Amino acid sequence: MSSGAAHSALTEEDVMKLLATQAHLGSTNLNFQMQQYVYKRRFDGPNIINVKKTWEKLLLAARAIAAVENPADVVVVSARPYAQRALLKFAAHTGATAIFGRFSPGCLTNQIQKTFKEPRLLVISDPRIDHQAVTEASYVGVPVISFVNTESPLKLIDIGVPCNNKGERSIGLMWWMLAREILILRGKISRQTGFVLDGKEIMPDLYFYRDPTETEKEETGAHAEVAETQEFQQQPDIDFTAQGGKVEDWAAETATWTNEGKTAADEWATGAQTQSNW
């Protein structure tokens, strides 16, 4: 094995990340073109993807993207909501051009449109959902790289990276790993230092999808905690160590407590005893 192949070999840490996010679990359906990437079929239906072949295709896709001189000529598209955050981070870290949400028909073919683009490479999350972008790319001769599941068609796809492209965390991890490999090939980071940009370590969960309702609840809870802390800090401080007046003779001080300490129950008992004597 050459030193370059050993340097880019799949590490145990990356394997654990793929397994933890279930990136190796495909769908129950199987396309005949994807059969070469399937390791075996699980007893309850899902097809298990060979993570070694996933890694090989991921490296091939990273080399193709890194070969483009201008990073802005790489257009990334995904209509899947789970991949929107990953697309934003991928474009910010690699310099690619991102198209969020719905892909407008004619974006690659109609020059009159304001959103018209002439990319050199197109990267998508799912060939089924992003079929419009794949079709237009074939019209203008733009190569297409896609994350593909076991049921995904490989027609018009130049490089398919087999993985679970439907999971919230798995698709985020795949975009994170692709961005990391691209930056390694460009020489901006190294495998020894890890995915570190501007002194900050980029973790995979930064690419994960976050539910807006859950994020709003977390922000509301944080504001409530801050308000409670400020209210507690505004309360006056009580000095429990302050000393009271000094008492010289406790016997003299407590002599007057006898009559003052009578309760209503004592008075009632005395009255009842007087009535019985009467």
Curated annotation (Swiss-Prot):
Keywords from the named record: Acetylation, Cytoplasm, Ribonucleoprotein, Ribosomal protein
MF terms (GO), sorted A to Z: structural constituent of ribosome
GO BP annotations, alphabetical order: cytoplasmic translation; ribosomal small subunit assembly
InterPro entries, A to Z: Ribosomal_uS2 (IPR001865), Ribosomal_uS2_CS (IPR018130), Ribosomal_uS2_euk (IPR027498), Ribosomal_uS2_euk/arc (IPR005707), Ribosomal_uS2_flav_dom_sf (IPR023591)
Modification sites for N-acetylserine: 2
Subcellular location: Cytoplasm
Subunit structure and binding partners: Component of the small ribosomal subunit. Mature ribosomes consist of a small (40S) and a large (60S) subunit. The 40S subunit contains about 33 different proteins and 1 molecule of RNA (18S). The 60S subunit contains about 49 different proteins and 3 molecules of RNA (28S, 5.8S and 5S). Interacts with rps-21.
PANTHER family, A to Z: 40S RIBOSOMAL PROTEIN SA
Its job: Required for the assembly and/or stability of the 40S ribosomal subunit. Required for the processing of the 20S rRNA-precursor to mature 18S rRNA in a late step of the maturation of 40S ribosomal subunits.
Protein's UniProt name: Small ribosomal subunit protein uS2
Taxonomic source organism: Caenorhabditis briggsae
